[in-house]
Amino acid sequence: ASDVYKRQAQILLFIYLGLTFCSTLALKLAGMNWFDALTQAMSAVATSGFSTKNASIGYFDSVAVESILIVTMLLASIHFGVLFATLTGRRNNIFHSEVTRWYLSIVAVVTVVVAGSLYFGGVYGTVAGALRYAAFQVVSLISTAGFATADTTVWPATAIVLLISVSIVCGCAGSTTGGIKTDRF
């Protein structure tokens, strides 16, 4: 039994450190200094929301940085065993996990609805702008990372209610996210 636990710990460490390394490198390539890249990456993988800047990720005002962190937060909120299965070519991977498909579907649908609310509510003048900020905030809250890129206090009630709703549902069991978990719905 101890060999099984040792193997599971190794897998968790491999996924956690691998995500942190890849995210750090990508953030550095996107223009951050090494300190900011490492701390934002560590926070995104841990889905803890700590930022070195008072304005959180909004400080960087970078689509590249936001995109990297969206991917990192999404991956960190998926069961690490499923991520490992995906990396090793096993059948029970991201594309075959029913929970992961549900989770990613929730993210996609809520992002589109929030973006529509922002665009038609006149908060952002372009669909691209509405999608940019909606995607980041939805992923940040459903993953329980808590990063911010926008002042959501000026967002329409529909967007706020959806953001609160996804922050309750959260990510998948076996990930770094907090909350109830998608698996239980």
Question: What are the residue ranges of the model-derived segments?
Answer:
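Membrane-proximal intracellular helices of multi-pass ion channels
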Residues: 2-185
